[in-house]
Curated annotation (Swiss-Prot):
Its EC number is 3.2.1.52. The gene is nagZ. It is an enzyme of class 3 (hydrolase). It comes from Neisseria meningitidis serogroup C / serotype 2a (strain ATCC 700532 / DSM 15464 / FAM18). GO terms for biological process: carbohydrate metabolic process; cell division; cell wall organization; peptidoglycan biosynthetic process; peptidoglycan turnover; regulation of cell shape. Substrate binds at D69, R77, R144, K174, H175. Pathway: Cell wall biogenesis; peptidoglycan recycling. This is Beta-hexosaminidase. The record marks D185 as: Important for catalytic activity.
Amino acid sequence: MTVPHIPRGPVMADIAAFRLTEEEKQRLLDPAVGGIILFRRNFQNIEQLKTLTAEIKALRTPELIIAVDHEGGRVQRFIEGFTRLPAMSTLGEIWDKDGASAAETAAGQVGRVLATELSACGIDLSFTPVLDLDWGNCPVIGNRSFHHNPEAVAHLALALQKGLAKGGMKSCGKHFPGHGFVEGDSHLVLPEDRRSLSELEAADLAPFHIMSREGMAAVMPAHVVYPQVDTKPAGFSEIWLKQILRRDIGFKGVIFSDDLTMEGACGVGGLKERARISFEAGCDIVLVCNRPDLVDELREDFRIPDNPALAQRWQYMANTLGSAAAQAVMQTADFQEAQAFVAGLASPQDTAGGVKVGEAF
């Protein structure tokens, strides 16, 4: 069977279960789609996951980019057969107790194990690291954050990024310009952060500046309003994305929207309007999760935005190690020692009350 050549479009969709239905195959063959994000509902065991990712990648060329939210702690989509990853705050605790060097070493090992295990299963990308500061205000961020100190967050995220690269993965810093100060969960409400730009620059934006200089591949903006900067949520704001992120910070990588079905995105209009405004604001790729009917709505009469960099940016996010090479790495004593070390950092309470973050069913 001839595999159709379909350039990757600017939409990342999802699927319902462990295998592709015929309807889902047709949806993923649409030129609007360029990638797919997987959730817990798509994982039964490692062999099933490998079969699913191979099936997805066989649909078209260039292959769809396959992503997952696999941060560690409360947000780890795949559990059985994978190393249990610690909450990122565990690395911050090591920073405080044992110093920067020990914490950075641990972060590098976490990144390496995280990426290699996913690479072995055909996954291209995990949406990590979380660059939000832990101000103690935001339960949905909480221990997903490395630390409250911007310097610690930046250094630990950079170490994690280096580990990800060893496992064949790029980094995606989130949630620009910072979700940690607000109380609300943008999956459920539209939070407001009333601080000034100068206050944000002095704290929350610092990790984004540093990571951008150090090769961060992608950024995901927050569905949060910062009314002293713009009345629109950051992910729909040209001020935040084109002016502050691109021009002022100098970020040259990929901008992914956060999920456009989240409550924090719903005040902007219907899905087509949300996508249009996201693209106009500066997003390269939009995520539409948990609502395949809305993906179909978006596909109708969809006009792919003019973005000459899209193909290159998609390709930049592709895995660089490959499944077979990653599986070979996993057989080495050195990697197995890293797995044991990382597993020793995790604790049962890491999963408490939060493993469904971002999942609707």
